[in-house]
Curated annotation (Swiss-Prot):
The gene is amnA. GO terms for biological process: catabolic process. One of its GO terms (molecular function) is oxidoreductase activity, acting on single donors with incorporation of molecular oxygen, incorporation of two atoms of oxygen. This is 2-aminophenol 1,6-dioxygenase alpha subunit. InterPro entries: Xdiol_dOase_suB. Heterotetramer of 2 alpha and 2 beta subunits.
Length: 271
């Protein structure tokens, strides 16, 4: 396994569309900072899983060499556009597809002009400055029928496949923490995690990540998803666990805060 860096980042577009909101801008700055750390680790490819790329029938991988378009987020469309220009390592993506099939996982590629790239993938690529011609990505979808364990297995499969090619890998899980949001308009300057119990759950999980106590972390994860209404069952973190073979030494939380009531964090893992 040749993973050189690993990160958890939020997929919300708010920090990037509304950096005038100080608390949201802090997420943007933190993501720019970890992007520098990612690139300093000198990966050959960046392996991305975003909870916002939904798949149902199969496990879908992005197999278009260059995806160039303008995206408008389905929730925050009033705040502007997200242009993107994303380069993928098609050979590695196709190798992952073949590895999935060999393991009994139905998989196929997406290679279409104007294919709808999800907000989370776009945000991660733009903020961290990856998905370039010099640093391409391999992007996996979030199959809605996969649970946390299946997501860990998928990540492990992808890492093994790419490592066999002798590539250095940076891995990213894109998604938030607690899932409750404000359901009425708020002053963004007064944003906070909407439920105190979810705020406490988020802080506990982040503290366990920092400690590197995987056993205690896994035990806490059993209840975290329900108690915090975690985004997509926190599968993006399980993606990281699977990619890292269930082990990391600790973590640095570069920023934690609220995004319209939900919790989110920018986390760098020590591997």
């Amino acid at each position: 396994m040749t993973i050189v860096s690993a990160f958890l980042v939020p997929g919300s577009p708010l920090p990037h569309l509304r950096p005038d909101v100080k608390s949201w801008e802090s997420f943007k700055v933190a993501m720019q900072n970890v992007g520098e750390k990612l690139r300093a680790s000198k990966p050959d490819v960046v392996l991305i899983y975003s909870t916002q790329w939904f798949a149902v029938l199969d496990e879908i991988w992005l197999t278009r060499q260059r995806s160039l378009d303008i995206h408008v987020d389905e929730n925050w469309h009033e705040f502007g556009e997200l242009p993107y220009d994303i380069y993928s390592d098609v050979d590695l993506a196709n190798a992952c597809i073949e590895s999935c099939r060999a393991a009994g996982v139905n998989a196929r590629g997406a290679d279409y002009e104007s294919f709808p790239i999800d907000t989370g993938t776009i945000v991660a690529c733009n903020a961290l400055k990856v998905g370039t011609s010099d640093l391409p990505v391999v992007v996996a979808s979030n199959n809605l029928y996969d649970d946390q364990a299946a997501t860990e297995r998928l990540a492990a499969l992808a890492v093994a496949c790419i490592s066999e090619k002798g590539k250095r890998i940076a891995v990213i899980g894109v998604g938030g923490l607690s899932g409750s949001v404000f359901t009425t308009a708020i002053d963004p300057a007064e944003d906070r995690v909407v439920k105190a119990v979810e705020d406490d759950c988020n802080k506990n999980i982040l503290s366990l990540m920092e400690s590197g106590n995987i056993q205690a972390l896994r035990e806490a994860l059993k209840s975290y998803s329900k108690e915090a209404r975690a985004e997509m069952g926190f599968k993006h973190f399980h993606w990281l666990l699977g990619a890292l073979d269930g082990h990391f030494k600790g973590a640095t939380v570069h920023h934690y805060g609220a995004l319209y009531g939900s919790g989110a964090a920018v986390v760098e893992f020590s591997i």
